[in-house]
Amino acid sequence: MVIVYFVPLPTKSQHITFTRMNRKRILALIAALITIGVTKAQDTVDIWNLPPLSIEQGRYTTDWDNLSRQYNTPAWWREAKLGAWSHWDPQSAAEDGDWYSRGMYMEGHPQSKFHREHFGHPSEYGYKELCRDWKTDLWDPEDLMQLYQKMGARYFLALGNHHDNFDCWNSKYQPWNSVNIGPHQDIVGIWEKVARKYGMPFGIGFHSTPARTWGQFMPVRYTSDKQGDKAGVPYDAMLTKADGYKPNADGTDKWWKGMDPQDLYGPIHHDGRKSLESPFANQFMWRVDDAIRKYQPDMIYFDDHAGDSQVDLGIDMGLGKLTPQIIAHFYNIADKRTEGRKEVVATFKGVGGRYNSFQRNPEMVGIVDRSLVKSTELYTEDDIMAFPFQTEVSLQEWHYQKGGSYRSAEEIITRLMQNVSRNGCLLLNVTQHGRGNIDDEARQICLDFGRWIDINQEAVYSARPFDVWGNNDVIYTRQGGHIYAVILHPSSNPIVLPALSSQSAS
């Protein structure tokens, strides 16, 4: 909508000479009014009826064969070996573990019981209230980035969104975001600036994929208790924008007046199996594009499968047909931005292995593997891989769990070296409290881990697999004509390295 101001003509006594400067001012005013109108229109965009995203054109196309021929995993990422991850969002505020925004709505679930005891019934205090009350006052991104570097990390990933559907940036296509709601901060934007300041390649993680969010998280919220005093009372996910204009019992306005809960919880649907055909799939593409263009990441991560043949919790998983579109779009944008000087990384799950999402067309696995970096959450490949991969692990729970235990520095070292020896990298989430800080125990583990890497860095950074990766006692890597043997369980006994015998060494 463009607003036009009509200026009355001057009387003879108020005669105005329309000089060139006057005309410039008038044109500037018109341009400003048009800009205001466009901005207003963008602010009120219907995120459930967006046109298809136009894929950025360039040397990469949406054809898998083209992608596999054109793409090379960048040297900066292959040499880095270790990345730090901030897997942190409003769900962290509850401090009751991962997938909280789903479990809190499932009557009988431990997280549902916790939520009612600590916050209230989800008809009165739903996930939108947890987002509203998310505070980040103890978050010190500069301190954490320095810790990540002391830990030995050489790239950093921020959580853009999780399955909860809340965006942690100044999102153009999701009004339920960290600038409008909760901390009123551009979390991703702040992380991006700090990472660049400390010379860390920057990435964004997208977990709000159609299968996870539309298929698994949204439908469980459209219900009510089956038992107890609140039986039959709808949870807050059933509310609409119109409900926000109804005053509270005491006559006050609802805090979310003007916002639409269905933008967070989704339009009510009870069958999320075919999520790629939903209006959410198109919205998801626009949100990814928005973050890519705003923050120019060196890496993007997707917590979902590249193919579409896996089923989880009764839902067809994977980005399927969207995967090559996302990859080509991201690669071409980065290619133009850097004039081809710097390659970027796109990470997806389910490319071969135990969770292969190309079961209907297994011949695609090798082609897809060459087109991106495959992700293996919590699972290290069994042998040396032909193409680089990434394993993601968390120091504690993915979202902070009060009373949860930590992995030791020794376990993280083992995980890292298992990956390096098999042609992979490790991405480590240093679990944050809801308010953004970390425990002293977590800090100490990071420092201990970092000291080990500093001493043994030749066996880590830029290293490549040896002829064999090793065994449960010793792990091998190589670099610059040298072979490194990492002893996992040092003892006073003689060390035997069978892989280096004259019969087996090359």
Question: Where is each model-derived feature located?
Answer:
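Short, Lys/Arg-enriched N-terminal segments with co-localized hydrophobic residues
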Residues: 5-20
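A composition/secondary-structure signal for short, hydrophobic, low-basic-content segments
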Residues: 10-11, 38, 83
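Intrinsic disorder/low-complexity segments enriched in polar/small residues
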Residues: 13-15, 25, 41-43
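Juxtamembrane/membrane-water interface recognition
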Residues: 16-19, 36, 209
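Bacterial N-terminal signal peptides that target proteins for export
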Residues: 19-27
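Hydrophobic h-region of N-terminal signal peptides that target proteins for export
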Residues: 32-39
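Mature catalytic domains of secreted/periplasmic carbohydrate-active enzymes
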Residues: 42-506
